[in-house]
Design a protein with these regions (language model features):
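Positively charged n-region of N-terminal signal peptides that target proteins for export
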Residues: 1-4
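Bacterial N-terminal signal peptides
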Residues: 6-16
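Conserved functional micro-motifs across diverse proteins
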Residues: 19-208
């Protein structure tokens, strides 16, 4: 029996909010630009550029994410912050930038983007309904003004006119640290239906 991606993300987020299991030691995933379909990699930033469009994806740490949420959404409490007593957070965060360089519109659907693990688990970026429902499932009150999180995350269809750009966060719940590899698939659609996409690949660093 297969479950909807949104339902899987909701359950995972609820566990992250409530009492996600802490791995014995830190697990590090390094970018792997050697895979077919990978974007261009510079540091932690993946990208794909053309005369018509550009897409950028940057993995960010907890401090950077919290600062971005505070600046964009005006929330003092980051809803994705590390649970007290845990050394690492229950979420993965990426900054995404989409730019339309063409003379026609560009459509970007965040829910069509995916995180996929080597275990063939899939999840879409978290949206506001999933975040709110997760707090309810964890029997925790949602932060005051949580609806303003939409100012920080890319939530819902984005339509860019010529020359426009949009940026925001993709937030995914953390997966089992036994996973060996994962990838983020990012795609936009140009007016004539042409796809514009790349993948960001990561592999677990071997312990010495």
């Amino acid at each position: 029996m297969r479950f909807p991606v949104a339902a899987i993300a909701l359950v995972g987020l609820a566990f992250s909010v409530a009492f996600a299991k802490q791995p014995a030691g830190p697990v590090v995933y390094d970018p792997d630009p050697t895979r077919p379909g990978a974007g261009k990699l510079v540091g932690e930033t993946w990208s794909k550029e053309s005369p018509a469009a550009s897409l950028w994806l940057t993995r960010i740490d907890e401090e950077t994410r919290t600062g971005f949420v505070r600046r964009r959404a005006g929330l003092e409490l980051d809803p994705f912050m590390t649970t007290p007593g845990r050394k690492t957070g229950g979420f993965l965060a990426f900054h995404v930038l989409v730019e339309n360089r063409s003379e026609t519109r560009l459509v970007f659907q965040p829910q069509a983007c995916r995180l996929q693990t080597s275990w063939k688990d899939f999840q879409a970026p978290l949206d506001l309904p999933t975040i709110v429902a997760a707090f309810a499932m964890a029997d925790r009150p949602e932060p005051v003004g949580i609806e303003r999180i939409r100012e920080a995350i890319i939530d819902g269809e984005v339509v860019l006119r010529p020359g426009e750009r949009r940026d925001g966060l993709f937030i995914f719940h953390a997966f089992d640290p036994a996973v060996k590899t994962f990838q983020i698939d990012v795609a936009a659609t140009l007016t004539r239906g042409e796809g514009f996409a790349f993948s960001a690949f990561y592999k677990k660093r071997k312990k010495k």
